[in-house]
Amino acid sequence: MKFDVIVIGGGHAGIEAALASARMGMKTLMITILAEQIGAASCNPAIGGLAKGHLVKEIDALGGQMGLTTDKTGIQFRILNASKGPAVRGSRAQIDMDRYRIMMRTIVLNTPNLEVRQEMVDRLLIKGDAVVGVETNLKNVYHAKKVIVTTGTFLRGLIHIGEIKQEAGRAGEFASNALSDSLKSLGLRLGRLKTGTCARIDAKTIDFSRMEVQPGDENPIPFSFRTDRKRFNPTQLPCYITYTNERTHEIIESNFHRAPLFTGQIEGVGPRYCPSIEDKIYRFRDKERHHIFVEPQTLEATEYYINGMSTSLPPDVQLEMIRSVKGLEHAEVVRYGYAIEYDFVDPTQLKHTLETKSIKNLYCAGQINGTTGYEEAAAQGLMAGINAALAIKEQEPLILGRDEAYIGVLIDDLVTKGTKEPYRMFTSRAEFRLLLREDNADLRLMPYGHKLGLVDEETYMKMIRKKEQIEKGLDLLKNSFITPNKETLELLSSLEEGKITDKTALVNVVARPTFTMEKLEVLVPEIQEFSEEAKEQILIEAKYHQYIQMQKEQIEKMHELMNVKIPEDLDIDAISGLSNEVKEKLKAHKPPTLFAASQISGITPAAIEILHIYIKMHQKRRVTK
């Protein structure tokens, strides 16, 4: 059978890739090992978080599905870092894992142009230097113009629970060994990574009265720009907080000799920022306790996820350490935690479109590219699906810049710097994070989503109206002035704001740390009729207008550098002043521009200056010939 696009895998990356492709008119096939598990959340029952919430909002602004499904299946919504600046705030939701999976599966199966097959892809079919289709374990052959690999942890997946090892892509599901061999046979460099998950506890056996309650926000904010914020009133369940203690640490330390992480049984590199509990105890011996978040997995709350206790220790040790924790003294484990090793593709072998450099029409997205997290996977899947469809339509690819989106930062980091450990998104990775906030993701990216046909007209026009209100409000603040007369001073005093001594632009008054939304509505009554989202934007943009302007100027300088193309026929070896290491990296990565070169790990500013000089010399020689 012939398709436009084949997506291998039905996880978070696979779903977004398949939906984007099908919604853009491509005849799409999703091949997945177990159709019932489309959209399954393999690890924690949550979407979003610091920087991850940004990704979900950006996915939504481009027309992706994750945010909307989270809003419909979420059972707790919180804004993390709410007391900090807007650039580092992050939306997070606990999801009902069952309903999330069922909803995603239903959406996939009901989407026009999208078919699903429950099979396992064993081999990629190659003609010349391009992929042309796949062969499955059932010996079925499917041809396609593009193939997107979104296999998650399934490539040679190996589960570890103490001394027990089991080939699996996820607990209870087959590993994909043949496809890993197929990728390797095509000359792609594969590495080995490791991640893990926590035990799930029977709710009946937990004493919640001995734990701290962590409720959701009183006025929850949805992820999706398509969700009606005024009517958003989800049923929310609390999470709970408890802590490890000295006894917990003793149990774990006395069983290091049984931990696959320390016995040499596990070879893959684990996530630095989400270590297992045994790794935490080993690395942070000075810590007297560690947070444990007890999170409901479904609305019925029959099982709880013990977040913070990811482990591959044997079952008897897991039970003992869990029962040493306050509130879990009588806990019964429904599912034990485990570690899983899996193959990944070195992402420096990919273009910014996520197409492989050496094999045409083959794309990789998600954990196969070395990332960790549902949100990072979904973002890559969406971009791979979009770019595969655009390539078939013979249209320009969508490559988001580091100044446009966290998705742009994510992909640029992967394809230029690569990763030796599971890559997780942080706000600190974004140079222009004050411009890349959650609250303005729609303004930044929805024009792309609308142009692609992934965002409907009604949603797009809602964004346009919001944008117009923001521009009108900021224009008022920047071009309206107040003078220190009696009326003005009385107004400021009534708002509990300090005096002004000179003629002052309203924007500078609003920029004060003490200035709130309520005060803004008094000072500028015209904005009272604006939407809540627009008013929030006006307040943020006004408060940080000087810093925002500085970042915009930095971006202009970056664009000048970005536009300097590196000629394909430039002889890198002939450039004196560059170290051999820099030359090797430039030849290996083949960056198209100076900016791309500057993002490669180990390429110094001095090397960029030298390269810039030689490019100018190269261009002059061309002109004189």
From Swiss-Prot:
Amino-acid positions noted as binding FAD in the UniProt annotation, renumbered to this chain: G9, G10, G11, H12, A13, G14, V121, S176, Q367
Any one of the GO CC terms: cytosol
Keyword tRNA processing part of the UniProt annotation: yes
Source domain of life: Bacteria
Compartmental location: Cytoplasm
Binding residues annotated for NAD(+), in chain numbering: 270-284
Keywords of the record: Cytoplasm, FAD, Flavoprotein, NAD, tRNA processing
Protein's UniProt keywords contain Flavoprotein: yes
Purpose: NAD-binding protein involved in the addition of a carboxymethylaminomethyl (cmnm) group at the wobble position (U34) of certain tRNAs, forming tRNA-cmnm(5)s(2)U34.
Family recorded in the similarity comment: Belongs to the MnmG family.
Name of the protein in its database record: tRNA uridine 5-carboxymethylaminomethyl modification enzyme MnmG
The organism of origin for this protein: Nitratiruptor sp. (strain SB155-2)
